[in-house]
A protein has these predicted regions:
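Secondary-structure edge/capping motif, primarily at the C-terminal ends of alpha-helices
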Residues: 62, 66, 99-102, 106, ...
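Amphipathic alpha-helical segments used for helix-helix packing
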Residues: 73, 86-113
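Hydrophobic/aromatic residues within well-ordered alpha-helical segments
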Residues: 40, 47, 51, 55, ...
Length: 196
């Protein structure tokens, strides 16, 4: 059912997808779908949680495989995230839905709230990475973490959005490492990312 929901959301967007269409795509009755999920938002939340759990498991594995301190691990996990985004169909479709097909409308308010809840969780994780990098002296102790988090999210989200929406498709595998390198260099060195 989750894969059917992913496919249907990917094709039609969230606002234009009905539970009936998802049930048909899954080859089950609408009643069977309601047995597991009370509404479309509940299904989207379960899908979001499942994919986020998978991403977290991949990040944990990446961290285990990486050499160096937490800052090097952060770089390694970001590189692997973008590799998976380009090569894994489920990741691709899920992020495509989030960035291009999660309409910000009144009828989609519950879905947007779910997405924001998960964004807040990732914001906390990025803040924890920055805190550890400061403690390990990989980053300056006067790092403005709030601005740094905004900078990281803007860079990563901007790269993802640009890749999905670009008419001239670029090679994410070649571009992402360079953008990540520039971002991390700025986090390490740029004076505007220091507390005033």
């Amino acid at each position: 059912m989750m894969l059917a929901a992913l496919e249907t959301f990917y094709r039609k967007g969230i606002a234009r997808t009905s539970l009936n269409e998802i049930a048909q795509a899954a080859g089950v009755t609408r009643g069977a779908l309601y047995w597991h999920f009370k509404n479309k938002e509940d299904l989207f939340d379960a899908l979001f949680q499942r994919i986020c759990d998978d991403i977290e498991n991949c990040i944990a594995q990446d961290a285990e495989d990486a050499e160096g301190g937490s800052w090097a691990v952060f770089r390694h996990t970001l590189l692997h995230f973008f590799e998976r985004l380009q090569s894994n169909d489920i990741y691709y479709k899920f992020h495509n839905i989030l960035f291009l097909k999660c309409e910000h409308t009144e009828q989609n308010a519950a879905v947007i709230a779910i997405a924001r809840k998960h964004q807040a969780i990732w914001r906390e994780k990025i803040t924890a990475v920055l805190t550890e990098a400061v403690e390990n002296q990989d980053l300056a102790d006067d790092l403005d973490k709030e601005t740094a988090v905004i900078f990281i999210k803007s860079t990563l989200d901007g790269l993802i959005w640009r890749w999905f929406s670009s008419c001239e498709r670029f090679d994410l595998g070649k571009t992402a490492p360079r953008i990540i390198g520039i971002m991390m260099d700025n986090l390490e060195n740029h004076p505007d990312l220091r507390r005033k």
